[in-house]
């Protein structure tokens, strides 16, 4: 896969996220979508500001680029939560409950990174899905589904350990992987 294709995909995801920030937490049908980048919204952010979705995706990309340990990725997620790393302004304005809980579990309990996610039935939001798309790209050349699925599972469990969340990630990431081929 060419670096240009990867960059275009990343840029599209970041722009789409920034377009969506002003509409977070709004009920469908209660607003008009602007045809240009606007600010405001629940978080009162400047136009073009991306959300935790992109920030955590950038943290994962940083991790994958350096090919380092799961602990190093959790350190990056911690830096996002504590210092606003990977944000356009250097300030965190949102983080999902399950992701925040997983980071606290890692920091406070010093848990194994792939065991930090909440295993409860109620920890089944899209928090894992929102940032894991780069895994499909990173595993582009991996021909074995079992190997890919193990990786999808490990990364998902860092923030979401319920089997439903893991299965959702496997289906989502494998669909992306298939689309890339």
Which ranges hold each PLM region?
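Structured, active/binding-site neighborhoods that engage oxygen-rich ligands
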Residues: 1-181
């Amino acid at each position: 896969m060419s670096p240009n294709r990867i960059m275009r995909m990343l840029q599209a995801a970041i722009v789409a996220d920034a377009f969506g920030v002003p509409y977070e937490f709004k009920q469908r049908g209660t607003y008009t979508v602007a045809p240009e980048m606007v600010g405001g919204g629940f978080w009162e952010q400047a136009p073009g500001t991306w959300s935790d979705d992109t920030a955590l995706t950038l943290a994962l990309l940083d991790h994958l680029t350096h090919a380092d340990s799961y602990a190093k990725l959790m350190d990056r997620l911690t830096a996002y939560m504590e210092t606003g790393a990977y944000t356009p302004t250097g300030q965190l304005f949102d983080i999902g409950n399950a992701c925040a809980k997983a980071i606290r579990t890692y920091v406070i309990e010093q848990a194994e990174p792939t065991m930090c996610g909440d295993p409860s039935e109620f920890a089944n939001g899209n928090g894992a899905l929102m940032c894991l798309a780069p895994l499909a790209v990173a595993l582009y050349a991996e021909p074995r589904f079992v190997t890919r699925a193990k990786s999808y599972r490990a990364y998902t469990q860092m923030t979401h350990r319920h089997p439903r969340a893991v299965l959702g990630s496997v289906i989502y990431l494998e669909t992306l992987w298939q689309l890339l081929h």
